[in-house]
Amino acid sequence: MDTVTTNIVTTDIRLLRLLQLSSVGLPVGGFAFSQGMEYAIDQGWVKNKTEVSDWIGLQLQQSLARVDLPVLRLCMDAAKQQNTERLFELNDLVLACRETKELRLNDTAMGEALFRLMSSLQIDTPFKRLDEMSFVTLFAIAANHWGLQVDLACLGFAWSWLENQIAAATKLVPLGQTQAQELLGELQTDIRHAIAMSLNIEEERVGAGLPAIAIASALHETQYSRLFRS
């Protein structure tokens, strides 16, 4: 009976850690970036709930599934093996996959914020304060530190990203709160498919190209007025 109770408590603690790490309340600033969506909406490329779903769903399948989630898995493996050199290599890889300065800033700004938080929570990392750190890499280190399974860490990462994107769309299109919840429900299937795809992608196959999103992100810098950071 004691063993069963211990297992339940351990599982509950890990679930709570997953919720903590993937919460939109995590102070890393994910809400500050639209990842090109603001420009796309301003130009009329994305005008309604259906087009928001297409825009976000494409990124889940072609970007997160082929870059962020595979690197997250590989970083968790490296962290588990305490392979610092490998972590730095993977960190460089994911940053090299960012197609614009804005997308790279999105990743490193969130990475720097998570680094500060992890330091406060006494989670060790091999990085130093002035290093250029990917949010993906640090998320993986934190997930490994808390004993999360790879598939659950990927789920939490993707869910957090999805919530931030839909929150941005809710402000920009704009969408109603009910429509936002409908989108969260619709795109859960895309998350599941993205994770399944990512588990089969090794380092040499990491990479994706989404020209429209890269263009939107690059041109967002000179957009006349912006709600989101560039």
From Swiss-Prot:
Pfam families: UreF (PF01730). It comes from the Bacteria. GO terms for cellular component: cytoplasm. Its main location: cytoplasm. It is found in: Cytoplasm. Keywords: Chaperone, Cytoplasm, Nickel insertion. InterPro entries: UreF, UreF_sf. GO terms for molecular function: nickel cation binding. PANTHER family: UREASE ACCESSORY PROTEIN F. UreD, UreF and UreG form a complex that acts as a GTP-hydrolysis-dependent molecular chaperone, activating the urease apoprotein by helping to assemble the nickel containing metallocenter of UreC. The UreE protein probably delivers the nickel. Required for maturation of urease via the functional incorporation of the urease nickel metallocenter. Belongs to the UreF family. This is Urease accessory protein UreF. It comes from Marinomonas sp. (strain MWYL1). The gene is ureF.
